[in-house]
């Protein structure tokens, strides 16, 4: 069972690392802000943030000092990634909204304040579940679920245009997959933090929470991969399906 649980974590780590690096490399070539924001968001929350926090929990007990350092790096990385996703949601979906810009700014300030508080007090979310830990995780879940809703809303609009032959079916599907992936990551994180608050133990010490996180991570990994690294067969399927709908 333990080996099965780690499949989802490994898939999420590999997919988010590959996609994140690719998006940042794409930004380096074309200097488009959305690619940078989503790339940093994926890398920060995924392989760096999630990876370090998971490894920090594994080290806890035998190597407490190293555990806190590694977990702390994960906290800062995940918070930076979450802020990048808040800015992405504002830039891509509501670029002219002052209210959304203010929301992204407040979220970024909140994430930074929580990180600095936990760093200055030496607390962490491994065992120390304080207000800053709850707020930081809530903000992280918020950026994921908000991004999921926005992506799925955008997908619905573009799907109508695709049926008229006015939108790229591959790009349209990318929004759908991104919505599914972000939603899975957000729900998985929400379940984990809720269980930790109620039970008072790290998620990795609660078997059913570990399984839930692994399965949500697996869904997020598959969706992320098909969103940004679709296979030729899958791309061909999307194009052929769109062509049939246009002809009908």
What label would you give each PLM region?
Residues 1-13, 114-153:
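Extracellular-loop-to-transmembrane junctions of the mid-late helices
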Residues 5-13, 68-81, 131-143, 206-220:
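Alpha-helical transmembrane segments of polytopic membrane proteins
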Residues 24-39, 63, 90-101, 161-170, ...:
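Membrane-interface helix-boundary motifs at transmembrane edges
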Residues 147-151, 174-248:
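C-terminal transmembrane-bundle signature of multipass membrane proteins
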Residues 88-121, 128-134, 168-180, 243-245:
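The cytoplasmic-loop to transmembrane-helix boundary for the fourth helix
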Residues 9-25, 29, 34-60, 77-82, ...:
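Hydrophobic alpha-helical transmembrane segments of multi-pass membrane proteins
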Residues 18-23, 83-91, 141-167:
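Alpha-helical transmembrane segments in multipass membrane proteins, preferentially the mid-helix core
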């Amino acid at each position: 069972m333990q080996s099965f649980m780690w499949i989802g974590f490994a898939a999420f780590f590999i997919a988010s690392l590959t996609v994140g690096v690719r998006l940042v490399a794409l930004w380096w070539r074309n200097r488009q802000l959305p690619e940078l924001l989503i790339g940093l968001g994926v890398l920060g929350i995924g392989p760096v943030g999630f990876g370090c926090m998971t490894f920090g929990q594994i080290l806890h007990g035998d190597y407490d000092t190293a555990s806190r350092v590694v977990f702390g790096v994960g906290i800062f990385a995940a918070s930076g990634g979450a802020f990048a996703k808040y800015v992405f949601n504002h830039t891509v979906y509501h670029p002219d909204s002052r209210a959304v810009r203010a929301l992204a700014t407040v979220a970024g300030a909140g994430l930074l304040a929580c990180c600095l508080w936990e760093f200055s007090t030496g607390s962490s979310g491994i065992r120390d579940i304080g207000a800053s830990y709850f707020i930081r995780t809530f903000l992280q879940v918020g950026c994921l679920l908000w991004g999921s809703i926005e992506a799925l809303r955008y997908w619905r609009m573009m799907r109508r245009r695709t049926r008229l032959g006015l939108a790229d079916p591959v790009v349209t599907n990318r929004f759908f997959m991104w919505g599914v992936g972000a939603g899975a990551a957000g729900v998985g994180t929400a379940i984990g933090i809720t269980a930790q608050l109620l039970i008072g133990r790290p998620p990795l010490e609660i078997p059913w929470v570990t399984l839930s996180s692994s399965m949500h991570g697996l869904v997020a990994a598959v969706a992320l991969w098909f969103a940004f690294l679709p296979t030729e067969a899958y791309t061909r399927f999307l194009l052929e399906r769109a062509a049939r709908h246009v002809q009908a």
